[in-house]
C-alpha cells in the first residue's frame, strides 16, 4: 500500500489514497482478502491516465504486490459525493468502471485511514446509523436482488460463499446500523453447521470445498429471503 502511495504521489494528479475494506477493519487474511483502496484524483481519468494506472498496477502485481489482490478505485474529486458515478477501478488484474458503494464509503468513514494525503473524514461526510442502513439496503436491493433472480449464478462456489456472508452482513447492518466484517459474518451465516464450518475454514485459507449444488441452493434461498425483506 505504501509503495502504491509513493508511486501515485509522483504522478502529480493523485492527492489522496485511503485504505478501506478488511485491512481497515482489521479482518485481513493474506491471499484470501482483497486490499481495498480508494484514490482521489484532480480531474477525469482519461485514456492517458488510464494507461498510466494500468502500467503502474501491472508492475506492482508482477512484483511487490504479487498475490496480494490489491485493488483501487480512482475517484475524481468533483464526483466524490455522487453515489451513482462510476470510476476507473483496478481489480484482479483489470481496469473496470465501478461505483464507490455506500457500504465502502461507510467503511472508509468509520474505519479507514490515509496512506497518502488527508484522512477520509476530511473529505467524506459522516454517516449515521440510518445512513449505513440505507447503504446496506441499496446493495441488497441492487446487485443482490439481480443475482437472486438468477439461480444458476449460485453454482459458482465463489458467489455462494460471498452471498452467504453478504446476506449476513446486510441483515446485521439493517438491524443495527453497524458494519460486520466477513469473518464475523461467517459466524452469522444462514446455513447448516457443516456449511458454516466449511466457510470458516475457507476464510482461514484452507482448501475445503462444499457440495456444489447443496451450497448453491442454500445460498440462493438465503439471498431470496434476505433481499425480499430488504424491499420493505
PLM regions and their residue ranges:
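A general structural signal for alpha-helical elements within enzymatic catalytic domains
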Residues: 9, 58-61, 228
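Nucleotidyltransferase catalytic cores
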Residues: 114-232
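Long, highly charged amphipathic alpha-helices
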Residues: 3-4, 52-59, 222
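Short, solvent-exposed loop/turn segments at secondary-structure junctions
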Residues: 24-25, 79, 169-172
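Catalytic metal-binding acidic patch
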Residues: 21-57, 69-73
Amino acid at each position: 500500500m505504501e509503495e502504491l502511495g509513493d508511486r501515485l504521489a509522483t504522478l502529480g494528479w493523485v492527492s489522496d489514497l485511503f485504505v478501506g475494506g478488511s485491512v481497515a477493519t482489521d479482518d485481513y487474511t493474506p491471499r484470501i482478502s482483497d486490499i481495498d483502496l480508494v484514490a482521489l484524483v484532480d480531474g477525469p481519468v482519461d485514456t492517458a491516465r488510464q494507461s498510466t494506472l494500468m502500467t503502474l498496477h501491472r508492475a506492482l502485481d508482477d512484483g511487490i504486490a504479487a498475490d496480494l489482490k490489491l485493488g483501487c478505485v480512482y475517484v475524481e474529486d468533483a464526483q466524490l459525493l455522487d453515489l451513482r458515478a462510476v470510476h476507473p477501478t483496478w481489480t484482479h488484474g483489470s481496469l473496470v468502471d465501478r461505483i464507490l458503494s455506500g457500504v465502502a464509503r461507510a467503511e472508509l468513514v468509520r474505519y479507514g485511514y490515509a496512506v497518502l494525503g488527508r484522512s477520509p473524514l476530511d473529505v467524506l461526510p459522516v454517516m449515521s446509523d440510518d445512513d449505513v442502513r440505507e447503504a446496506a439496503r441499496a446493495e441488497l436491493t441492487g446487485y443482490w436482488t439481480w443475482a437472486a433472480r438468477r439461480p444458476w449464478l449460485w453454482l459458482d462456489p465463489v458467489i455462494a460463499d460471498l452471498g452467504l456472508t453478504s446476506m449476513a452482513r446486510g441483515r446485521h447492518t439493517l438491524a443495527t446500523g453497524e458494519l460486520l466484517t466477513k469473518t464475523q459474518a461467517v459466524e452469522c451465516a444462514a446455513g447448516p453447521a457443516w456449511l458454516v464450518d466449511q466457510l470458516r475454514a475457507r476464510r482461514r485459507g484452507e482448501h475445503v470445498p462444499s457440495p456444489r449444488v447443496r451450497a448453491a441452493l442454500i445460498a440462493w434461498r438465503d439471498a431470496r429471503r434476505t433481499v425480499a425483506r430488504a424491499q420493505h
